[in-house]
From Swiss-Prot:
Biological process, per Gene Ontology: protein folding; protein ubiquitination
The reaction(s) this protein catalyses: [protein]-peptidylproline (omega=180) = [protein]-peptidylproline (omega=0); S-ubiquitinyl-[E2 ubiquitin-conjugating enzyme]-L-cysteine + [acceptor protein]-L-lysine = [E2 ubiquitin-conjugating enzyme]-L-cysteine + N(6)-ubiquitinyl-[acceptor protein]-L-lysine
Signal peptide: none
Job of this protein: May catalyze the cis-trans isomerization of proline imidic peptide bonds in oligopeptides thereby assisting the folding of proteins. May also function as a chaperone, playing a role in intracellular transport of proteins. May also have a protein ubiquitin ligase activity acting as an E3 ubiquitin protein ligase or as a ubiquitin-ubiquitin ligase promoting elongation of ubiquitin chains on proteins.
Record region (Disordered): 197-222, 439-474, 492-516
Similarity remark: Belongs to the cyclophilin-type PPIase family. PPIL2 subfamily.
Record-annotated U-box domain positions: 38-115
Biased composition (Basic and acidic residues): 439-450
Induction text: Induced during the meiotic cycle.
Gene name per UniProt: cyp8
Protein known as: Peptidyl-prolyl cis-trans isomerase cyp8
């Protein structure tokens, strides 16, 4: 029911669409949709879209400054050498360092009037000095009186040195949506180029692999790589469960056991039973040692591989304590250096019956629990207090007289030998890991031979007939046109007679009259 206050015409508020949508505001809505933008604040980096800490800028041909942060623009210029916003060529020399003043409230402001900068402020900077001012300040104190000196440090400049940081009437270079669109366009171009390169490489690989020479070489390389067996873990890869719970994962419907790396499988203390043997060559003589691969595989593997690489060559024994031990294995000779073959410390190995109870025991030196590197020591006598603190991985089996000579070398107060004890080289006589690999290859070879013999038996029937021959004949016919009649070969045509046989003439006469 109408009220007496209702107007009989459309008011301005109703026509403008303040309280809702109607047909009369379609033109305004279209205008707003075309002119809407998201302005990037002046104190934000155009590359990272985050507030800058070390502001700088690149200037385009219209003297509009594009603001960046040094932390993000420098790596970009080193890698691409272009302006990330407009794609123009740029270098480190084109960067201009900007200097913004701050007031007591820690807000960016004009250094002369101390007026805070906002999104509606017209901000300019001097190219030669990098100082940022309000346009009103520059116009009133520099342009109109023609006083071409910086208002902060009195450095002279020209009108061309004035660059625009932010113009509230021209915010195209600070349009957030335009910057995002340019980044997405550049990303799409990279993806397109990568797809084209991938297709070209695939086409090239298919052409190259189609050649018989390359296919033969690939087959030979596969056979060499497959000499060692593939070891599987007791757990699965987990791909089936991951594909079930994640929509972004490629569907997998089969559980497969995970593959164990050869080194991880080999360094299990139950795998290798071979002992290793090596010789330590010093300037006082040679010492033969035995390596306990079955008790400390990681320590032995580390020692053997470092020795093969020449890591211990021409080093010194930096610590020598009579009736206790002699220590070496540090290339720096200080006792604070050296690293393992893996580049990081490895764990201790105490799950064995070995004890520090005899002369000639070889153990790993460390700085604490699970800090083994490259240093080792040889005992001059029993040291039970070292049990379960240092990993035992070998013992001296020859050259104890050389060990006696090393023990007699005089030392200083820091236990450093007064005369250098040089470790000239370590020679590996028996590498237990190479022996294990040979055994594994032989086992794999015997296994394949047995499988081939079983397959040969499967291809022979109980009557002794070779089923592979019939299968090959069938495979030859399994092609296009196998149901068409086979053409007669030339040999068949030559041996086929084309002369028709002579017809026998019927005999005439009286014949025999016995039936009469």
């Amino acid at each position: 029911m109408g009220k007496n206050t209702d107007k009989l015409y459309i008011t301005q508020t109703e026509h403008s669409g303040v309280h809702g949508w109607h047909g009369g505001m379609s033109g305004i809505a279209q205008k707003n949709s075309t002119t809407s933008y998201k302005q990037l604040p002046f104190n934000y980096c155009s590359l990272s879209l985050q507030p800058f800490n070390h502001p700088c800028c690149l200037v385009d041909e219209t003297k509009q400054a594009i603001i960046f942060d040094f932390r993000f623009i420098v790596p970009w210029l080193r890698k691409h050498g272009t302006n990330p916003i407009n794609g123009q060529k740029a270098s480190m020399s084109d960067l201009i360092k900007l200097k913004f003043a701050k007031n007591s409230a820690e807000e960016y402001c004009d250094p002369v009037t101390m007026k805070s900068f906002t999104r509606f402020s017209h901000i300019v900077a001097i190219r030669s000095t990098g100082n940022c001012f309000s346009w009103d300040t520059i116009e009133r104190l520099n342009i109109k009186p023609k006083h071409w000196r910086d208002l902060v440090n009195e450095e002279q400049f020209t009108r061309d040195d004035i660059i625009t940081i932010q113009d509230p009437h021209n915010v195209e270079n600070r349009d957030f949506s335009a910057i995002q669109k340019q980044k997405e366009t550049a990303r799409d171009e990279k993806i397109t180029k990568a797809k084209i390169a991938l297709q070209a490489s695939r086409a090239k690989s298919t052409e190259s692999t189609s050649s018989p020479e390359l296919s033969h070489s690939l087959d030979s390389s596969k056979s060499i790589a497959s000499d060692m067996p593939i070891h599987r873990a007791s757990h699965t890869t987990g791909y089936a469960a991951a594909s079930l719970t994640s929509t972004s994962f490629t569907p997998v419907t089969k559980n497969e056991r995970a593959i164990i790396a050869e080194e991880d499988y080999m360094l299990n203390h139950t795998r290798i039973k071979h002992k290793g043997y090596a010789r330590i060559v010093t300037n006082h003589g040679e010492i033969n040692i035995e390596l306990h691969t079955d008790y400390a595989p990681h320590a032995v593997y580390n020692f053997v591989q470092l020795a093969k690489q020449g890591y211990y060559r021409n080093t010194i024994f930096h610590r020598n304590i009579a009736r206790f031990m002699i220590q070496g294995g540090d290339p720096s000779g200080t006792g604070r250096g050296g690293q393992s073959i893996w580049g990081k410390p490895f764990k201790d190995e105490f799950c064995n019956p070995l004890k520090h109870d005899d002369r000639g025991i070889i153990s790993m030196a460390n700085r604490g629990k699970n800090t083994n590197g490259s240093q080792f020591f040889i005992l001059y006598g029993p040291a039970k207090h070292l049990d379960n603190k240092h990993t035992i991985f070998g013992r001296v089996v020859g050259g104890l007289n050389v060990l006696d000579a090393l023990e007699k070398v005089p030392t200083n107060s820091n236990d450093h030998p007064k005369l250098p004890i040089k470790l000239e080289d370590i020679i590996i006589f028996v590498d237990p890991f190479e022996e294990w690999k040979k055994d594994e290859r032989e086992k794999e070879k015997r296994k394949r031979q047995e499988e081939e013999e079983e397959n040969n038996l499967d291809r022979t029937s109980w009557t002794g007939r070779d089923l592979s021959a019939s299968s090959t004949d069938h495979s030859l016919n399994a092609s296009v046109g196998k149901y068409l009649k086979k053409e007669v070969s030339l040999e068949e045509k030559t041996f086929t007679s084309t002369v028709n046989p002579k017809k026998k003439k019927a005999r005439t006469g009286f014949g025999n009259f016995d039936a009469w």
